[in-house]
Amino acid sequence: MASKLCDSCKSATAALYCRPDAAFLCLSCDSKVHAANKLASRHARVWMCEVCEQAPAHVTCKADAAALCVTCDRDIHSANPLARRHERVPVTPFYDSVSSDGSVKHTAVNFLDDCYFSDIDGNGSREEEEEEAASWLLLPNPKTTTTATAGIVAVTSAEEVPGDSPEMNTGQQYLFSDPDPYLDLDYGNVDPKVESLEQNSSGTDGVVPVENRTVRIPTVNENCFEMDFTGGSKGFTYGGGYNCISHSVSSSSMEVGVVPDGGSVADVSYPYGGPATSGADPGTQRAVPLTSAEREARVMRYREKRKNRKFEKTIRYASRKAYAEMRPRIKGRFAKRTDTNESNDVVGHGGIFSGFGLVPTF
């Protein structure tokens, strides 16, 4: 599609659109028309669409760095989901006159918002960023020394120390010498020879006295429970610790597979009270495993009981049985009774039950 021609000269390609005049103008005609008077120089103008070059630009796509009209913006950014995520801003109109000497590129940056494209010709800002990054990489001044010894942090420099007296130098060497790069955590036994050598090399013996002592791991853990399954008839015994209880469980019951009764568990001693007694009677005996003869006797008794069982037919609901016998039947099935039949049935069967006050049971 051919580009849109200028509405003024009708020969050159239109480069911008004047909104107050509603006219497409080329660069030369724009400079002539809008430089005529002060009122014309205030006209807001926008660039042409960079895709179709037929309509004025409406938005600026920051991802594509292109000014687009409404139609091209809809067609391009609805093609796929990735294009829909492009950030777009409205076109900012400009009021300066545009010269036709090849400065269109520079003016295009002005019509696009400078806050979004500040790094196009920003050599100064790039230099500032490089200087800021280099400031983080600068090494500290060798004349300035920061030391930390025995909890004291001090900064000494050549400019801050007035004079070079031997007394001051001696004090600095005595107070602010180089610290040991490793911390002494005082774990385990330390060789006295190595320790004295480190203290002499550091030169900080007179600043803060360090008490070297051996940290011993406690051998007895509090709140511990000892389970003794080695056997024997010993009960629960007090282990001697503050909160440590030693449990000794008899394993004779575990060997035969029978749960012991309450008498097999002995007393437990507690530090804050008297001995805890079991709920069972201490005079009761433990369960003894059955012998083969006793087991055979039990099996025989069970078999005798099973043989002597009686399966007799008993009438559980006598009243229901009597009522079922009174109801009329047709071919063995119950039939509906009419009023006359009901009266006849009552009269006919009245003599049978006349001598009984209750429903008979069979």
Curated annotation (Swiss-Prot):
Transmembrane segments: none annotated. The keyword Glycoprotein does not apply. Zn(2+) 2 binds at C49, C52, C72, H77. SMART domains: BBOX (SM00336). Zn(2+) 1 binds at C6, C9, C29, H34. One of its GO terms (cellular component) is nucleus. One of its GO terms (biological process) is regulation of flower development. GO terms for molecular function: zinc ion binding. It is found in: Nucleus. Keywords: Metal-binding, Nucleus, Repeat, Zinc, Zinc-finger. A zinc finger (B box-type) spans 6-48, 49-91. The keyword Metal-binding applies. Residues 295-337 form the CCT domain. Pfam families: CCT, zf-B_box. Belongs to the CONSTANS family. This is Zinc finger protein CONSTANS-LIKE 4.
